[in-house]
Amino acid sequence: MASSLILASASPRRLALLARIGIKPELVLPADIDETPKKGELPLEYVRRMATEKAEWVASRHSECHILAADTVVAAGRRILPKAEDEKQATSYLKLLSGRRHRVLTAVAMQKDDAPTTVKVSSNIVTFKSLSPREIEDYVASGEWRGKAGGYAIQGYAESFIRFLAGSHSSVMGLPLYETRHLLMNAGWPISASSSFQEEYA
């Protein structure tokens, strides 16, 4: 087993989700990559590529470590909705998602030594209630959308917009724990309910 685990993400949500299964990375190191979707790239292709590139970017600088990376994207049909850049874009996202079903895809990647990067993808279906102009304006003003794929955060106020969810709540938050646990165990990391309990109540 490698000497340490690095989380290739700046997301505090992913760090908190790892703690739920008793995992505490030795280092948190966000990858510095271009996250612009390629022309014609489908949401599934994009999210797999992003998670892979994040893991490989960090691995190229810490080849002796295990690298865990993840990427989340909201997709309305074939359209990729990355993080909103400003209030105008966040508003347009919410108008698009209002009253309709969309997908939330999270890819998680594990890179160790010189082995090929292993990637697993969790696909989830989310349906929003119909949002009034006032609700959209109020949510955008809250700032909760900042740094969130699709312009909303399921772990915050926006959860009250969700009429239906099929899939993994942790995946929509940014890290599917089922797939992550599988990757970590295959990489040789000891995971147990007791270690998770100790981490939570330490």
UniProtKB/Swiss-Prot annotation:
Predominant place of localization: cytoplasm
- Reported EC number(s) for this entry are 3.6.1.9
Query: What Pfam families does UniProt report for this protein, alphabetically?
Result: Maf
Disulfide bond annotation, renumbered to this chain? none
> A GO BP term, please?
nucleotide metabolic process
Q: Does the keyword Cytoplasm apply?
A: yes
Task: Please give the name of this protein.
Answer: dTTP/UTP pyrophosphatase
